[in-house]
Amino acid sequence: MSATEKRRYEVLRAIVADYIASQEPVGSKSLLERHKLNVSSATIRNDMSVLESDGFIVQEHASSGRVPTERGYRLFVDSIHDIKPLSLAERRAILGFLEGGVDLEDVLRRSVQLLSQLTHQAAVVQLPTLKTARVKHCEVVPLSPMRLLLVLITDTGRVDQRNVELEEPLAAEEVNVLRDLLNGALGEKTLTAASDALEELAQQAPTDIRDAMRRCCDVLVNTLVDQPSDRLILAGTSNLTRLSRETSASLPMVLEALEEQVVMLKLLSNVTDLDQVRVHIGGENEDIELRSATVITTGYGSQGSALGGLGVVGPTYMDYSGTISKVSAVAKYVGRVLAGE
């Protein structure tokens, strides 16, 4: 990169920083006043003209300054080398808050609450998918003579419950046999790999519990194996209401994408790397609902394996360095808590 190119990048960086702080078009005079660029106003104006020609900034009105384009934000983000570190107090607060979680879902709920507060954006986390989870235990609880509760516990800490209606009541000993057979068939298997075992078990169970076993297996296969219920936890969607006038028109589409979850589930399901933070700016998002927003995501998990994705959704003029740092930190601390460190 030549000296001229370096200077122009510094001008772009200053424009992005000022626009993020104010959401107001940035002019050459304010750049010289706020930043030590050590060049003349004529040079700044020339650099801004070149940056505009190259598509990194745009002048929205003839009498106004410039604002960054999505291409300008992308160059800015790709050039970030010094991610803002969290203070010791922030790190202790994050870990202490997450360690107060009573189970996996509570830890994840706390993580998005914390992330939305730290970044002032909407935060989202994907609960571990059942598709890759392994069964640790299947509890069978009689709710009434004609109804059972199946409680499935996976190695990710996720707990799912389903009711099973019976044709005939089961004795306590029969419930115990049914429980043991289910755990024998499901133990340490992924739910996708358990389907064949459950179908075989339904056919080979002892005659006196075969109908009950068939009903239990049907419920597990139909609702947990064939149609695993991936879910999201959201926090801080109200933060999006502070969007600038230029982007507030797209707010309903962004909120709809968050609330209906399908778009975000698809995006987070592709997050498999624990060490990489991904930044999708505006039109880089595949789904039209998010093309006016920036989405920053990473994976969380333990022992080198990702259990799901988490991240934030906000305007394209967000504090990229600080937000990337906080998304990464919260994900790492979630992993530490899940690993019991």
Swiss-Prot record:
Q: Which HAMAP family match?
A: HrcA
Task: Give the GO terms filed under biological process for this record.
Answer: negative regulation of DNA-templated transcription
Task performed by this protein:
Negative regulator of class I heat shock genes (grpE-dnaK-dnaJ and groELS operons). Prevents heat-shock induction of these operons.
Q: Would you tell me the protein name for this molecule?
A: Heat-inducible transcription repressor HrcA
Answer whether the UniProt record assigns the keyword Transcription to this protein.
yes
Write down the superkingdom of origin. Answer: Bacteria
Q: Which GO terms describe its molecular function?
A: DNA binding
Keyword vocabulary terms for this entry: Repressor, Stress response, Transcription, Transcription regulation
Q: What family name appears in the similarity comment?
A: Belongs to the HrcA family.
User: DNA damage as a keyword?
Assistant: no
Q: Which Pfam families match?
A: HrcA
Q: Which organism is it from?
A: Corynebacterium glutamicum (strain ATCC 13032 / DSM 20300 / JCM 1318 / BCRC 11384 / CCUG 27702 / LMG 3730 / NBRC 12168 / NCIMB 10025 / NRRL B-2784 / 534)
The record's section on SUPFAM superfamilies has: GAF domain-like, Winged helix' DNA-binding domain
